């Protein structure tokens, strides 16, 4: 009632990042050779509240390609077509592929993360696999409309136990502990399953 409404023509990059897959794609758009949103355009500065950290460090056996590796990251494994937020650690022998890893998460030695969104302060144990198998079509049992394209989502401060194996379209609730995986035989979480925090 009575308020003025104004429109503005915008020809720049825009994407609705509400759906999980759209958020994932928007982040991975940034690692392209000519990204639709140029983070290095000096005429369009990004003002952020990120804390000061040391530069990213790549170890002697590290390999990072087609990726954004933020300040404070330490990479001793392989990172491909991924976005690493500040403070992420990728340990020796670990592989991160087609994934978004948020603030201060640790990917343990020999772990594999493939096609995932991992929230901040998560620990992925040694030798664990997040996003395994070829079945990208079986939707998540709890979020079938949101997780049905092969992306596995891990919530904030979750702890994935060493040797665990999570399929595609899995959902790991925030603050899940290793003992919350006890109901899965041999720590294998099938595609489309959810890991809940014990009450």
Predicted regions and their residues:
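Left-handed beta-helix
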Residues: 1-199
